[in-house]
């Protein structure tokens, strides 16, 4: 069970699978092709962040539902309560079990299908999230993690994405070997660590009718304010976070290059040692003396420990996420500039 710290979630190892009438996925294929979320679940996640989320502190919770064929239906959720390290008596597993037992008593879907987490400017590609999602998927194959971005949502566009670990990454995590050779053999790169699952938000017919009536009653206001450029604080913060991750990547590259230099240096030392031994044996043979006894060269020259490369892959994935966010932000603002210029030219 993963501890609930920033960027982590509680694993679902102690709960039963949510598989309903769906069939098991074939080896190497994703068990979930689509995520269907009730509108009530989306509102609960947003409400949870508004009540307890502050700054870069994340909020997390449990997703409940069931699996039908290759579709994961999320019908309910409940939050993890905020607590500090001083709350030594708080038991997350017991809390989750009591919540799910209470939901079962009132005939609400109580099967564990994943977890959700808020993010701060897209900062969610972390080792804590990787470990938590691996625990979920290892226990319940169909589990997903929902990433909610409150900053993008506040700008007028709901940002809610579902992710799963790819089968390749699941195998690597099971082996717990994150050496450069193991990741290269598994062909793991930051592009194929996570897979995004399409999301469909479903509402009841009555809610859809109510939304349609509200849309009809809403007064038509001046829409020119929609062309206002977004705050530059968003771009500045994203660039600052991007530079921080680039610095971390640079430090990891220096460590890896140091490891490669040490390996090369040791190979040269081993080669020189073997040549000296060979020349000395030739001289001893010419003098009629027995050759030197065989020695385990690996004991004399212990290979340097390779640095784990998983952190570098996660940093690269986070850098890619920041770049995509900056790209979307700039594309929206450039579009607004062109539209504003066209309107100004038209009015003139």
UniProtKB/Swiss-Prot annotation:
Ranges annotated as biased composition (Low complexity): 267-285
Classification via Pfam families = eIF3h_C, JAB
Q: Where in the cell is it found?
A: Cytoplasm
Q: Which GO terms describe its cellular component?
A: eukaryotic 43S preinitiation complex; eukaryotic 48S preinitiation complex; eukaryotic translation initiation factor 3 complex
Gene Ontology MF, one: translation initiation factor activity
Keywords per UniProt: Cytoplasm, Initiation factor, Protein biosynthesis
Q: Which InterPro entries match?
A: eIF3h, eIF3h_C, JAMM/MPN+_dom, JAMM_MPN+_peptidase_M67A, MPN
Q: Tell me, in a sentence or two, what this protein's role is.
A: Component of the eukaryotic translation initiation factor 3 (eIF-3) complex, which is involved in protein synthesis of a specialized repertoire of mRNAs and, together with other initiation factors, stimulates binding of mRNA and methionyl-tRNAi to the 40S ribosome. The eIF-3 complex specifically targets and initiates translation of a subset of mRNAs involved in cell proliferation.
Subunit structure and binding partners = Component of the eukaryotic translation initiation factor 3 (eIF-3) complex, which is composed of 13 subunits: EIF3A, EIF3B, EIF3C, EIF3D, EIF3E, EIF3F, EIF3G, EIF3H, EIF3I, EIF3J, EIF3K, EIF3L and EIF3M.
Its name, as the record gives it, is Eukaryotic translation initiation factor 3 subunit H
Q: Which gene encodes it?
A: EIF3H
């Amino acid at each position: 069970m993963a501890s609930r710290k920033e960027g982590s979630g509680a694993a679902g190892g102690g709960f039963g699978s949510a598989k309903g009438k769906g069939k098991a996925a074939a080896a190497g294929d994703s068990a979930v092709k689509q995520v269907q979320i009730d509108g009530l679940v989306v509102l609960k996640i947003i409400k949870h962040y508004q009540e307890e989320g502050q700054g870069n502190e994340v909020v997390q919770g449990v997703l409940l539902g069931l699996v039908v064929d290759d579709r994961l239906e999320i019908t309910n959720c409940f939050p993890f309560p905020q607590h500090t390290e001083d709350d030594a008596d708080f038991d997350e597993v017991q809390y989750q079990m009591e919540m799910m037992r209470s939901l079962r008593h009132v005939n609400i879907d109580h099967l564990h299908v994943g977890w959700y987490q808020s993010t701060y400017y897209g900062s969610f590609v972390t080792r804590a999230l990787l470990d938590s999602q691996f625990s979920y998927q290892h226990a319940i194959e169909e589990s997903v993690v929902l990433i909610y971005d409150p900053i993008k949502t506040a700008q007028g566009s709901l940002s809610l994405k579902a992710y799963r670990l790819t089968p390749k990454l699941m195998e690597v995590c099971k082996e717990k070997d994150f050496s450069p050779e193991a990741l290269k053999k598994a062909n793991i790169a930051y592009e194929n660590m996570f897979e995004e699952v399409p999301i469909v938000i479903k509402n009841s017919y009555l809610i859809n009718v109510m939304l349609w009536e509200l849309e009809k009653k809403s007064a038509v206001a001046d829409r020119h304010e929609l062309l206002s450029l977004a705050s530059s604080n968003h771009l500045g913060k994203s660039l600052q976070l991007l530079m921080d991750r680039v610095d971390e990547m640079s430090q990891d590259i220096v460590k890896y290059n140091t490891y490669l230099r040490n390996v090369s240096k040791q190979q040269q030392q081993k080669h020189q040692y073997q040549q000296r031994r060979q020349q000395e044996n030739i001289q001893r043979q010419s003098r009629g003396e027995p050759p030197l006894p065989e020695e385990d060269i690996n004991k004399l020259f212990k290979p340097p420990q390779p640095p784990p490369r998983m952190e570098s892959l996660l940093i690269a994935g986070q850098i890619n996420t920041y770049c995509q966010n900056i790209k979307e932000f700039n594309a929206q603002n450039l579009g607004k500039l062109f539209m504003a210029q066209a309107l100004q030219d038209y009015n003139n």
